[in-house]
């Protein structure tokens, strides 16, 4: 009976010991697991913190890099804008200078053209005036020549008419004198005065010559 109780006690003690051992092992394992979990959590937290710090630093660096990039781009844009503005000013200056030069050349060409036109007009006017004077002089000379010819023709016509008139008068006078002398001779012959007839003929011839001389003098005048 006692052996049976001792055995039961022994078994109970072993069971308790094993239970305690298992409990201790379980507790130790739990502690180990908890520590391991804690360590892992700490590592994770540290890693996360490191990542966060790294991310923060990376963000800062990125922001800095972005700021530097933007600043660089801004400076480049400003520089480019400055170059563009300077080039625009230079181009505008060249364009203005070219426009002024072109305007000056155009004005000078216009003045020269106007001067040439004025000179041509003066020359043409002078030529026209000279031609008009020459034409007037030629017309006046022609008029004088025609007037002289007309005067000469009138003079010649008058002299010719005078000569003709003088010839007709002289012829008529001679015919009248001849007829008168004939009648006188007939009368003298009838009266028997032939000697006187010769004297009368002499007188008649003298009168005839005198008349001819008078006619000649009149015709010459």
Curated annotation (Swiss-Prot):
- Annotated region (Disordered) at 1-221
Compositionally biased, Low complexity: which spans?
43-52
Q: Where is the composition biased (Basic and acidic residues)?
A: 33-42, 53-63, 72-147
Q: Which UniProt keywords apply?
A: Repeat
**What disulfide bonds does the UniProt entry report for this chain?**
none
Q: Name one GO cellular component term.
A: nucleus
Provide ranges: composition bias, Polar residues.
212-221
The entry assigns this protein to a family as follows: Belongs to the LEA type 4 family.
What is the protein's given name? Late embryogenesis abundant protein, group 3
Species name: Zea mays
């Amino acid at each position: 009976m006692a052996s049976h109780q001792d055995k039961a006690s022994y078994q109970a003690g072993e069971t308790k010991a094993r239970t305690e051992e298992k409990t201790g092992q379980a507790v130790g394992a739990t502690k180990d697991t908890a520590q391991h979990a804690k360590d892992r959590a700490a590592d994770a937290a540290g890693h996360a913190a490191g990542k966060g710090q790294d991310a923060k630093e990376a963000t800062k660096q990125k922001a800095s890099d972005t700021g530097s990039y933007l600043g660089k781009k801004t400076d480049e844009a400003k520089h480019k804008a400055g170059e563009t503005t300077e080039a625009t000013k230079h181009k505008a200056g060249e364009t203005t200078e070219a426009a002024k030069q072109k305007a000056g050349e155009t004005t000078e060409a216009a003045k020269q053209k106007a001067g040439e036109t004025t000179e041509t007009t003066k020359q043409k006017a002078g030529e026209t005036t000279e031609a008009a004077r020459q034409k007037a002089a030629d017309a006046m000379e022609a008029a004088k020549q025609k007037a002289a010819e007309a005067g000469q023709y009138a003079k010649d016509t008058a002299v010719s008419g005078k000569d003709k008139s003088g010839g007709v008068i002289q012829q008529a006078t001679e015919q009248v004198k001849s007829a008168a002398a004939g009648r006188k001779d007939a009368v003298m012959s009838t009266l028997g005065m032939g000697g006187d007839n010769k004297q009368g003929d002499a007188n008649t011839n003298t009168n005839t010559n005198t008349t001819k001389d008078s006619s000649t003098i009149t015709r010459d005048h």
